[in-house]
UniProtKB/Swiss-Prot annotation:
Belongs to the UPF0291 family. Transmembrane segments: none annotated. This is UPF0291 protein CD630_10710. It is found in: Cytoplasm. Keywords: Cytoplasm. One of its GO terms (cellular component) is cytoplasm. The keyword Cytoplasm applies. InterPro entries: DUF896 (IPR009242). Gene3D superfamilies: Helix hairpin bin. It comes from Clostridioides difficile (strain 630). Coiled coil: none annotated.
Amino acid sequence: MFDKKKLDRINELAKKNKEGILSADEIKEREILRKEYLENFRAHFRSRLDSVKVVSPEEYEQYMKNNKN
């Protein structure tokens, strides 16, 4: 999971960027944090997709019959 402090820092840098007051070091930091965030997001998203199972309507119907509560 991505660290909340890093996400807060990304948002802080984004706000400063909108105001047009980012230094060169802050631009580099922003890019590094963004890259790390996107890598984490993509990995998590891929793992979620890997756990998805596509079923036919018949399989779904059978599943629902077997799992009535």
